[in-house]
Amino acid sequence: MINSVGVVRKEAENCNCLQVFFVSGSFKVDSVEAKKKEENFRETLRDMANSKYEYVKSFELEDEVMLPNLMVVRIDGRDFSRFSQVHEFEKPNDETALNLMNSCSAAVLEEFPDIIFAYGYSDEYSFVFKKTSRFYQRRASKILSLVASFFAAVYVTKWKEFFPQRKLLYAPSFSSKVVSCASAEVLQAYLAWRQQDCHANNQYDTCFWMLVKSGKSVSETQEILKDTQKQQKNELLFQKFGINYKTLPELFRQGSCLFKKKVEETVKHDENGNPVKRLRRKAVFVHSENIAGRSFWNEQPSLYNDLGHFTKDIGKIEPDFIRSFQFENKLLPLTWVVVRIDGCHFHRFSDVHEFEKPNDEQALKLMNSCAVAVLEEFEDIHFAYGVSDEYSFVLKKESELYKRQSSKIISAVASFFTSTYVLQWGEFFPHKELKYPPSFDGRAVCYPTYNILLDYLAWRQVDCHINNQYNTCFWMLVKSGKNKTQSQDYLKGTQTREKNELLSRQFGIEYNSLPVIFRMGSSVFRLKEAENGVVSGKKLEGEVVVDHCNIIERCFWEEHLHILSYS
C-alpha cells in the first residue's frame, strides 16, 4: 500500500505506467486536505496518461480508395470446403445453399444503398459501389470488414429459414478484399473474369463429382480430369453420364447477379379498393450468360448511370488486369499486428435491444465469449482486450497468418466474431429476440516494438476508464430525471474528481466499487503451459481465459511473459 501522495508521485516518475488511479485502494488518506491532493493527483495522472498514450494513433495508416476508382468488395467463404462437408451440402451444387448466399447478398444491397450491383456463385460474392460513393470515407479496411461482417451475420440469421431441419454446427466466416477498378473498362474485365471462373469451376466440379459418384476415387478423378479442356469435359459429361452441360440450371453455370432497378409496386389501396402503384428502386436477381457484355449492361439504366457504359465486348482478359485484381497489401514483417473491431451503430443496436445503461453485463459477457472463440479459432492471436462494443486482437510478432495479407486477416476476424455473436446470442439473452443482424468494422495496425504495443493497450484501457466514468454519470443523471441534453450540459468540462464527487454525493456510488469488468474492461489470453506437463489448479494449460486486470502497469506483463512470448 502506498502511504502518501509524495511516494506515489515518486513511483509514477520512475515507472512506465502513470495510471495508478486504476488500482482500487492504492492510496491511504488521513485528512481531507490529503484526500484533495490525492484526487488532484489522480486527475493529473489521467491527463498525463491519456496524452502519453495517444501517440499510438499515429501508426494507423490511411487506406482510402481514391476517386475516380470504382470500388468492388469481394467476399469468399473461409474454408467453405470443410463447412459444406460438415453441413452435408449436395455436390457439386447445393441449390438451397446458393439461395441462402443470394438472400444474404440481397440483404447487403438493402443495408448499403451505395452498392449498385452484385455478382456471386458458390461461396463468393462481389459487390460494386456506385462510382461517386463516399461510403466510410472510402476507407478500404473499414468497408471490406463491414461487408464481410454483415454478410456473415445475415448468413447465420437466415440459416434456419433455408435449412429448417439442419443445425448450424459452427460459425461460418468470410474473407474479403477491396478491388479498385480505374474505369468501367476495368470493372468489365473484373466481372468477366469472375464469371469465367464460375463457369470453369462449375464445369470441373460437375465432372469431378459425377466421376466420384460413379465409383472413382478422388485421386483417380483428379488424374482423369488433369489438363482436360472445356470441350473434353463437355464430352465426358455427355458420353459417360448423358448430361448436356448447357441444360444445367443457369444458377450453377452462370452465377447470380443482383442490381437495383425501378419496378412497379403496390404501395396502398384507395377508398374503392383499387391498388395505388408507384415506381420503386428494388433489387432484382438476373441470370445472364455474359454479365460483362454490352447487350446486358447497357440495357440497364441503373447500371450505366451509376457505374458507366461498357463501350465494347470483352474478349481475352488482360493478364495485367488479373494481376491487379489479385494484388494483396501485406503487413510489415516482424511487427506486432493489432486487429481492432468496433460495433457499427451500436448505440442504436443497444437501444433497440434494450441493453441496460450505462453497462449491460450480459452484453459484455457475450462480447467476451466471442473474443474467446476468436482466440480458439486463430492460434496466432495471443491476446485480446475489449470494452463496450470494441475488441483489440494482438497477433504474435512472427505471425504469418494469411501470409500477413491485411484484408484477409481483418475480414476473417471481424466476420468470425460477428457470426459467433449471432450464434451465441440466445445463450446470453434467452428471452430476448435478436431483432436485426449486428455488424463490426475493423482495421489492422502494425506496432514496431513491444513497448509501443503495450502503450497501445494502455491507451485502450485509459479510454475504457474515461468513457465508463462519463457514461456512469450520464445515465445516473438521466435516470434521476434529467433529459439527455441537460445531462450532457451538466457534465461538460467536468474532471475526474468532479465526476467521482457527483456519483458519491448525489447517488451514493463509489466509482472504485463498481464491477471491475466495467472499469477495466476484459483481457483474454491463454494460460501458461506447464513446463513439466503438470498444471496446478483446475484450469487446463493453454486454456483461453477472461480476466479483468490492470494491463497498464508493466507488472501484469512481467508476470505473464508467456502471453506475448517476450522476455
From Swiss-Prot:
Its EC number is 2.7.7.79. Keywords: GTP-binding, Isopeptide bond, Magnesium, Metal-binding, Nucleotide-binding, Nucleotidyltransferase, Nucleus, Transferase, tRNA processing, Ubl conjugation. The keyword Nucleotidyltransferase applies. Pfam families: Thg1, Thg1C. Coiled coil: none annotated. GO terms for molecular function: GTP binding; magnesium ion binding; tRNA guanylyltransferase activity. Mg(2+) 2 binds at D342, D389. Mg(2+) 1 binds at D342, G343, D389. One of its GO terms (cellular component) is nucleoplasm. There is a cross-link at K397, K403 (Glycyl lysine isopeptide (Lys-Gly) (interchain with G-Cter in ubiquitin)). It is found in: Nucleus, Nucleoplasm. Gene3D superfamilies: 3.30.70.3000. Its cofactor is Mg(2+). Binds 2 magnesium ions per subunit. GTP binds at D342, G343, C344, H345, F346, H347, S388, D389. GO terms for biological process: DNA damage response; G2/M transition of mitotic cell cycle; positive regulation of cell cycle; tRNA modification. InterPro entries: Thg1_C_dom (IPR025845), tRNAHis_GuaTrfase_cat (IPR024956), tRNAHis_GuaTrfase_Thg1 (IPR007537), tRNAHis_GuaTrfase_Thg1_sf (IPR038469). It catalyses: a 5'-end ribonucleotide-tRNA(His) + GTP + ATP + H2O = a 5'-end phospho-guanosine-ribonucleotide-tRNA(His) + AMP + 2 diphosphate + H(+). It is an enzyme of class 2 (transferase). Belongs to the tRNA(His) guanylyltransferase family. This is tRNA(His) guanylyltransferase 1. The gene is THG1.
